Amino acid sequence: MPRSCRDCLPMMPTELSAVLPARHIQEECGVFGVYAPETTDVAPLAYYALYALQHRGQESAGIAVNDDGVFTAYRDVGLVNEVFPAERLRSLGTGTIAVGHVRYGTTGSDNKRNVQPILVNHYKGRMALAHNGNLTNSHALRQELESQGSIFQTTTDSELIAYAIAQERLRCRSVEEAVCQALR
């Protein structure tokens, strides 16, 4: 039987600093999504979540609202409260789904084209995508897809994910299945 907590731990917390990397801010984008079973004001929920996540990224903000397949979105550079004054937030309307994004750019440039969520029209419908992180093979994947005739509107790796989902959607019965297949 252990006599103290120290007997149970491989290292005491004070010893961990010797083996862990130095602590420093490692920001990434902030992403939020909400689903409501009935049509309601989902945009303000996304707004407040993005406001809380704003420390994650302060280059730009965007919200897309889905009301039974009809998308309303706004995206721009700036802080959340600058991008979404009350009237603009109201203009997003109501819906059952909202996705929001605040950007901390790690790939692509910091221009308006790269503001997320990305809105995509494809053969089987429409989607809004917000992504946090980096694809480790984004450069090679973009080159491969462009050599096959793909055209991209942004310089972010997030658009590669949207493209992969749209391609899988051609073969899959549902968007959920397409997402799973695209991310394998």
Residue ranges and their predicted role:
Residues 2-184:
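Conserved short alpha-helical segments that host acidic/polar catalytic motifs at enzyme active sites
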